[in-house]
């Protein structure tokens, strides 16, 4: 789990000028986090599992965008599968041993970074489809999507390695913890590196890519003659950027303040406790982005919603209502090449 999140679960923090009691923070976490994590897990798991099932059974992964959407959903599922254990950890202690501590820490961070990287790829994919449409016909193939997805997973594993290596389960006070333990001689370096890397990769880089790509997309869309579709596309772009910023910026700001408490004059017990509580709230807020991803990247497409309706008619309605009137048959999609435009692209004809 994230470094700053785990520190809030200790009874005492000896990093202050004098020992700082963390019992109140632990009690708040024990009451607040388990139900919040459970809600995020339920809604996020259902939404992302539906995306995976529809992409595989209905869309058949016919485009590069489908490949990226599938991997984004898998990243979110990997991340979400760790939440039940973190919920138990917040309420009690780590009861699952050292091996599980490392495994679930790895799943958490690979899902976290993988999700961010695939959002970046989807942003670039949309940019190519709209701004460089001719080039995109040759470049945006299923094969290229599979290759870049493989490279992206390798990158997600590499940036997760420090957390996997330094995280371990051990007895801390009266409870067993699962948290990072940096070498004492390099403690400050690794703590600062961890925070700066996370801020760059999860906030600065995605927002920079979004600003550059969506600025180019907006310039192209403003020349679109279909005013209704143009306005819909502009609203969608604005919503994607605002949602990402609102969900992840608070967490990254609090993480920065928490790591550099002395620099910001916050290295006292009361400030540390407030930052720990803020970390609990903002990280949970960031986690809920996993529930939003299926909506803004998949279900917003009219064609994807038709696949969702067909999926429920075929796999759910028939089982729940065996004696209902004959359900309308789904219309098969005409065969298409690897260059077929994806769900979001069909929605406004150019890539969103």
UniProtKB/Swiss-Prot annotation:
Bias-annotated ranges (Polar residues): 337-346
List of residues that carry Sulfotyrosine: 3, 10, 14
Alphabetized GO MF terms: C-C chemokine binding; C-C chemokine receptor activity
Membrane-related topology note: Multi-pass membrane protein
Chain positions with Phosphoserine modification: 336-337, 342, 349
Region annotation Disordered: where it falls in the sequence: 332-352
Glycosites: 6, 17
Gene name tied to this protein: CCR5
GO CC, any one term: cytoplasm
Disulfide bonds: 20-269, 101-178
Cytoplasmic side: 59-68, 125-141, 219-235, 302-352
Official protein name in the record: C-C chemokine receptor type 5
S-palmitoyl cysteine lipid modification positions: 321, 324
Source species of the chain: Oryctolagus cuniculus
Entry function: Receptor for a number of inflammatory CC-chemokines including CCL3/MIP-1-alpha, CCL4/MIP-1-beta and RANTES and subsequently transduces a signal by increasing the intracellular calcium ion level. May play a role in the control of granulocytic lineage proliferation or differentiation. Participates in T-lymphocyte migration to the infection site by acting as a chemotactic receptor.
UniProt keywords, alphabetically: Cell membrane, Disulfide bond, G-protein coupled receptor, Glycoprotein, Lipoprotein, Membrane, Palmitate, Phosphoprotein, Receptor, Sulfation, Transducer, Transmembrane, Transmembrane helix
Location within or outside the cell: Cell membrane
InterPro entries referenced in this protein's UniProt entry, alphabetically: CCR1-9-like, Chemokine_CCR5, Chemokine_rcpt, GPCR_Rhodpsn, GPCR_Rhodpsn_7TM
